């Protein structure tokens, strides 16, 4: 009887501890995102920063549609390259910095010894390759996580590769460390890696999650920095958190501080909020129960605008939404059919992406937007053709006076689900010249990009909403209700208020 009582008390304490440390958290967890430029001296000119960012955006988008990769069932766009998150894995107190990427579904980082092929032109990692802690364990070949890492390959095949005896495979007895998950290959749009799957504890502020699964890579191609995948797959960070704590894993949001490549602004932390839910008093914009007695415009500006996530059979980890059109001033330009829906082959839709800098649109739709924009701005300001090739952006203009820029509104699917972008999110102004060759002049560029002809995009993503256009918004990924929301925020102030 005494033994039973002790055992009961022991298990109760364990349950209480686990419940307290993971499941009972009713408040969101706040993490900070740092821009990759914040770790550098950031002495590059605006033109150089624009060119490098536009080149990365184009590569991340276009290489996803490369014909040589069409045979692959599921391929992330590319690893993210703008915002870094710091995580602590295992018993070691040291943290590892990873790119936050909503376009992929795996958490991985470089492990010692580490070799990166073709990384000479890549940014230096903010932290050295990690060593596995003594508490790390290999994931067995029969684990569902192993199958997920191997693109849903059956566990029987994986265990056969791991030399698990046939009778063990038939009886399901391969679930030991003696038969680990085989190394897996993971490809991005412009890089790849080979890694092994491990399990260890994940430490976040106020919470520790046991049995967290991650990839440990000893060799990569053009990928010197690890990635925290926040996509919709089984191995993503939100999905694994949801297993331990639905509150933390069923919703997350970030609020990217508006920086315009300014060296001071780019060093401000941007809040990443795990377990962020819309307050019950804060009504969803565009629903039938949205009946305000007063016309409080300020309150409405702070409300979330939601649009439903689209299901993608080919890329199930993407946060794809339906774009109905874009307004330039008072003119609404309808979006092509491929941006409104996803076809049976997984083509189309707009991916809300944290890892691509600039928004990419299909050529015909992009040209219609540019034509309307240019008809309003170009009739007053001289076109800066010389700057466009060196910036990667178009159109650009010389600004000799105060420029009147038409409003730009994104119309997503859903009743009143429209998002008005702040001017700085789509029109970048900077000084160029003054080097003795050209006089110093003020220039402004439209910050949208041509993603290529629709014929080239078939079977792949139709468009991408880049992180530059997401600045100054809290973007919430409501995984429980399968929707994405946008609300205007002063992100730097939000960080200060939530700390």
Swiss-Prot record:
One of its GO terms (biological process) is proteolysis. Glycans are attached at residues 175, 211, 400, 415. InterPro entries: Aspartic_peptidase_AS, Pepsin-like_plant, PEPTIDASE_A1, Peptidase_aspartic_dom_sf, Plant_Aspart_Prot_A1, TAXi_C, TAXi_N. Disulfide bonds join 111-119, 396-445. It comes from the Eukaryota. Residues 83-487 form the Peptidase A1 domain. GO terms for molecular function: aspartic-type endopeptidase activity. Residues 1-26 form the signal peptide. It is an enzyme of class 3 (hydrolase). The active site is at residues 101, 353. One of its GO terms (cellular component) is plant-type cell wall. Pfam families: TAXi_C (PF14541), TAXi_N (PF14543). Its EC number is 3.4.23.-. Keywords: Aspartyl protease, Disulfide bond, Glycoprotein, Hydrolase, Protease, Signal. PANTHER family: OS07G0603500 PROTEIN-RELATED, PEPTIDASE A1 DOMAIN-CONTAINING PROTEIN. Belongs to the peptidase A1 family. This is Probable aspartyl protease At4g16563. It comes from Arabidopsis thaliana (Mouse-ear cress). The lineage of its organism: Eukaryota, Viridiplantae, Streptophyta, Embryophyta, Tracheophyta.
């Amino acid at each position: 009887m005494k033994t039973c009582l002790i055992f009961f008390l022991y298990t109760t304490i364990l349950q209480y501890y686990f419940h307290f440390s993971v499941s009972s958290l009713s408040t969101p967890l706040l993490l900070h995102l740092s821009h990759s430029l914040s770790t550098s001296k950031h002495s590059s000119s605006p033109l150089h920063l624009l060119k490098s960012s536009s080149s990365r955006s184009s590569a991340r988008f276009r290489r996803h549609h490369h014909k040589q990769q069409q045979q692959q069932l599921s391929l992330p766009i590319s690893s993210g390259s703008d915002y870094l998150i710091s995580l602590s894995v295992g018993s070691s107190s040291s943290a590892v910095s990873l790119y936050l990427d909503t376009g992929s579904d795996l958490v991985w980082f470089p492990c010692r010894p580490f070799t990166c092929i073709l990384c000479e032109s890549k940014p230096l990692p903010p932290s050295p390759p990690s060593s596995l802690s003594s508490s790390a364990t290999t994931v067995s070949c029969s684990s569902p996580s192993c199958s997920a890492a191997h693109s849903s390959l059956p566990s029987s095949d994986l265990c056969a590769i791991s030399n698990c005896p046939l009778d063990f495979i038939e009886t399901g007895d391969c679930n030991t460390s003696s038969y680990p998950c085989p190394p897996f290959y993971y490809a991005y749009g412009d890089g790849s890696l080979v890694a092994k799957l491990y399990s260890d504890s994940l430490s976040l502020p106020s919470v520790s999650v046991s049995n967290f699964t991650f990839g440990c890579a000893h060799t990569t191609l053009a990928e010197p920095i690890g990635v925290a995948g926040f996509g919709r797959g089984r191995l993503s960070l939100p999905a694994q958190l949801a297993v331990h704590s639905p509150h933390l894993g069923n919703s997350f949001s970030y609020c990217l501080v508006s920086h315009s490549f300014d060296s001071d602004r780019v060093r401000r932390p941007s809040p990443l909020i795990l377990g962020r839910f819309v307050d019950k008093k804060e009504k969803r914009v565009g629903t039938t129960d949205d009946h305000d007695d007063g016309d409080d415009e300020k309150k409405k500006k702070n409300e979330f605008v939601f649009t439903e996530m689209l299901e993608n059979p080919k890329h199930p980890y993407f946060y794809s939404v339906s774009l109905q059109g874009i307004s330039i001033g008072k003119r609404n330009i309808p979006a092509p059919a491929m941006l409104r829906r996803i076809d049976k082959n997984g083509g189309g839709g707009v991916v809300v992406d944290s890892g691509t800098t600039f928004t990419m649109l299909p050529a015909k739709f992009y040209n219609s937007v540019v034509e309307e924009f240019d008809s309003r701005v170009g009739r007053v300001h001289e076109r800066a053709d010389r700057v466009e090739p060196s910036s990667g952006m178009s159109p650009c203009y010389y600004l000799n006076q105060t420029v009147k820029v038409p409003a730009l509104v994104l119309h997503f699917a859903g009743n009143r689900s429209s998002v008005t972008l702040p001017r700085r999110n789509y029109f970048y102004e900077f000084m160029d010249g003054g080097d003795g060759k050209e006089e110093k002049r003020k220039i402004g560029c439209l910050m949208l990009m041509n993603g290529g002809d629709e014929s080239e995009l078939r079977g792949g993503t139709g468009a991408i909403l880049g992180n530059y256009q997401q600045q100054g918004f809290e973007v919430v990924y409501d995984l429980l209700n399968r929707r994405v929301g946008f609300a205007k925020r002063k992100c730097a102030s939000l960080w200060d208020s939530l700390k």
